Swiss-Prot record:
Transmembrane segments: none
Keyword ATP-binding annotated: no
Protein name from the UniProt record: Large ribosomal subunit protein uL1
GO cellular component: cytosolic large ribosomal subunit
Assembly and oligomerization: Part of the 50S ribosomal subunit.
Domain of life: Bacteria
Gene Ontology molecular functions: rRNA binding; structural constituent of ribosome; tRNA binding
CDD domains: Ribosomal_L1
Keywords: Repressor, Ribonucleoprotein, Ribosomal protein, RNA-binding, rRNA-binding, Translation regulation, tRNA-binding
Protein's gene: rplA
PROSITE patterns to which the protein is assigned, alphabetical: RIBOSOMAL_L1 (PS01199)
Function: Binds directly to 23S rRNA. The L1 stalk is quite mobile in the ribosome, and is involved in E site tRNA release. Protein L1 is also a translational repressor protein, it controls the translation of the L11 operon by binding to its mRNA.
Keyword Ion transport applies: no
GO biological process: regulation of translation; translation
Length: 231
């Protein structure tokens, strides 16, 4: 674990771990701790009231953040014929089939998102052991296996984030960058929370949205009062 800077240690002393902060105050504290020379990511951890060990309580999906992520997303698409042309027109960085699969097998993967037309899964399916561990395997549940490859490409380029609850029942995601103003960060977090609520499993009991905390890439986490998140 990276050592905390003097400024981060001082801030850690200012943050009350038992307190729920209004979103604006939480973000102000997080930005104060973001001392790296690069434009740090502002991240969120959402504790959900689910048992992620049960298959019917795995929360997974994708949402387009209205204000983007502040990052340029490189998109690869497995498609052929008309679908390949649609993907290129929508702005895909790499489009192919067997040639793209060969590139992946060679370890050449200059992309952040992989999208596949349904008829391309015969090729993509052979790449599971490579793409899966990297979180790149296309999946219909998050809209990356779809006949509408153009929309999928546009969504990825517009700032779509994929989310999946981990074994501890927590969803981790970015909501922007330190350079974003509070309104943009709040709008992005509100969109993520809305998507999580829509993805709530029918079998989830009790309080669903349990804890929300924001942090920077290298900073401390600050708990947020969920009543102050709505954009």
């Amino acid at each position: 674990m990276a050592k905390l800077t003097k400024k981060q240690k001082a801030l850690q002393g200012k943050v009350d771990s038992t307190k729920l902060y209004a979103f604006a105050e939480a973000v102000a504290l997080v930005k104060e701790a973001a001392t790296a020379k690069f434009d740090e990511s502002i991240d969120v951890a959402v504790q959900l009231g689910v048992d992620a060990k049960k298959s019917d309580q795995v929360v997974r999906g994708a949402v387009v953040l209205p204000n983007g992520t502040g990052k340029t997303t490189r998109v690869a698409v497995f498609a052929q014929g008309a679908k390949a042309e649609e993907a290129k027109a929508a702005g895909a960085d790499i489009v192919g089939m067997d040639d793209l699969a060969a590139q992946v097998k060679a370890g050449d993967m200059p992309f952040d998102v992989v999208i596949a037309a349904p008829d391309a899964m015969r090729v993509v399916g052979t790449l599971g052991q490579i793409l899966g561990p990297r979180g790149l395997m296309p999946n219909p549940k998050v809209g990356t296996v779809t006949p509408d490859v153009a929309t999928a490409v546009k969504n990825a380029k517009a700032g779509q984030v994929q989310f999946r609850v981990d074994k501890a029942g927590i969803v981790h995601s970015t909501i922007g960058r330190r350079s974003f103003d509070n309104d943009k960060l709040q709008g992005n977090l509100a969109a993520l929370i809305e998507a999580l609520n829509k993805a709530k499993p029918a079998t989830s009991k009790g309080v669903y949205l349990r804890k929300v905390a924001v942090s920077s890439t290298m900073g401390v986490g600050v708990r947020v009062d969920t009543q102050t998140i709505a954009a």
